[in-house]
């Protein structure tokens, strides 16, 4: 979201970090995104930017050699529901919980996000805003 939205407070930081990933200047060699996160991002880009930006974002993802799309299965959705149900004290979105379940299943510890919920859940968020 921050990469595509020019008005996002973290846009410049996100662009710099994305460029570092592209040049191999981070521990990441590829990025993963789930179909649930794509859904959320498309909706937000449509609302905050434009339909054109949202469509462009999806096309870039599909063509990217850097980004791999991972799908939330029924099993992962059930695990996400357990996380969501368990954490009434946090303001995790259900999409956040699907990401947590997916990351746990794939043994992914680091996440490229500015969403503090990931560090609250125990993942390492980069870059630091």
Predicted regions and their residues:
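Histidine- and aromatic-rich ligand-binding microenvironments
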Residues: 32-34, 92-93, 115, 127-129
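Short acidic, glycine/proline-enriched helix-loop-strand junctions
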Residues: 61-73, 87-89, 118-129
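Acidic, PIN/NYN-like endoribonuclease modules and their adjacent C-terminal/linker elements
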Residues: 100, 105-129
């Amino acid at each position: 979201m921050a990469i595509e939205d020019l008005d996002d407070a973290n846009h410049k930081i996100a662009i710099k970090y994305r460029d570092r990933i592209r040049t191999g200047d981070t521990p990441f060699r590829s990025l993963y995104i789930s179909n649930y996160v794509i859904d959320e991002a498309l909706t937000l880009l449509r609302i905050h930017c434009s339909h054109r930006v949202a469509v462009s974002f999806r096309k870039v993802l599909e063509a990217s050699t850097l980004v791999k799309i991972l799908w939330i299965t029924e099993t992962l959705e059930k695990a996400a529901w357990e996380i969501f149900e368990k954490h009434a004290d946090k303001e995790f979105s259900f999409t956040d919980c699907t990401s947590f379940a997916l990351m746990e299943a794939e043994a992914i510890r680091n996440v490229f996000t500015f969403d503090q919920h990931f560090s609250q859940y125990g993942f390492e968020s980069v870059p630091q805003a």
